[in-house]
């Protein structure tokens, strides 16, 4: 691997942790993003980046014509997804406004090679929508729940499923939502036992946590 002169990459992360280094694109130039993706793809066979702004994507794609950019998730893929697991991971989002964060989680899981199913717009304002899908959600090995506003949905789901639940607060909401802080605090104070919470808008973090939970549970199986 020829390493870019602006970054010190970690090509051994795939062997060490089970997933490769993923490029955070938001604060990088198009050339830096392209260089890093190209180098990681040379080392691992493929590469993936998150938070690539839509207005910068054409510049990156001009440098990497074989790459694929997804507008909803703001992710970019160079090469083919990995093949790592067959367990189903569910991504449940409260509202359509939460879609960018849920899409980031879904796209990241897809790159990592996991089976993933997204259940969109089934928040607590119309709780019957969740009840209509709950049996499908219960078939998942891990459930990622994405919600803004008051952040109630993860607590509700956490009381209805036996799988681990990862809560993702989003910055969606009006004034006193404080750009996701209200949802974050609500999730951290959930009465649903065992709920775990990642940072505001961090669909990527949830997508990395879910497979690590699965890998540990598989190690402990007889």
Features from the language model and the residues they span:
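Long amphipathic alpha-helical segments
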Residues: 1-67
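Short glycine-rich or small-residue beta-strand-to-loop segments that form or flank ligand, phosphate
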Residues: 23, 47, 88-94, 143-145, ...
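Short glycine/serine/threonine-rich phosphate/pyrophosphate-binding segments
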Residues: 33, 98-103, 127, 147-157, ...
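Glycine-rich oxoanion-binding loops at beta->alpha junctions
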Residues: 77, 115-136, 181-182, 198
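Glycine-rich phosphate/diphosphate-binding loop of Rossmann-like nucleotide-binding domains
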Residues: 86-126
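C-terminal binding/interaction regions
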Residues: 93, 135-138, 172, 176-222
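Glycine-rich phosphate-binding loop
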Residues: 132-170
């Amino acid at each position: 691997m020829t390493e870019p002169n602006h970054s010190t990459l970690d090509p051994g992360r795939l062997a060490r942790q089970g997933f490769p280094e993923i490029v955070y694109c938001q604060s990088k130039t198009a050339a830096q993003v392209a260089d890093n993706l190209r180098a990681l793809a040379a080392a691992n066979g493929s590469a993936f980046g998150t938070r690539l702004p839509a207005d910068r994507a054409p510049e990156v794609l001009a440098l990497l014509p074989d790459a694929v950019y997804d507008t909803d998730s703001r992710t970019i893929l160079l090469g083919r997804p990995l093949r790592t697991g067959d367990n189903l991971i569910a991504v449940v989002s409260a509202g359509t406004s939460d879609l960018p964060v849920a899409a980031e989680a879904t796209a990241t899981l897809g790159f990592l090679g996991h089976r993933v199913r997204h259940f969109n717009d089934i928040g607590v304002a119309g709780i019957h929508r969740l009840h209509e899908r709950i049996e499908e959600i219960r078939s998942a090995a891990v459930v990622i729940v994405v919600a803004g506003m008051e952040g109630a949905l993860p607590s509700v789901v956490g009381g209805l499923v036996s799988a681990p639940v990862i809560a993702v607060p989003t910055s969606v909401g009006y004034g006193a939502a404080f750009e996701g802080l209200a949802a974050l605090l609500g999730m951290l104070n959930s009465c649903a036992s065992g709920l775990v919470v990642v940072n505001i808008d961090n669909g990527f973090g949830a997508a990395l946590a879910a497979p690590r939970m699965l890998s540990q549970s598989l190690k402990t199986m007889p």
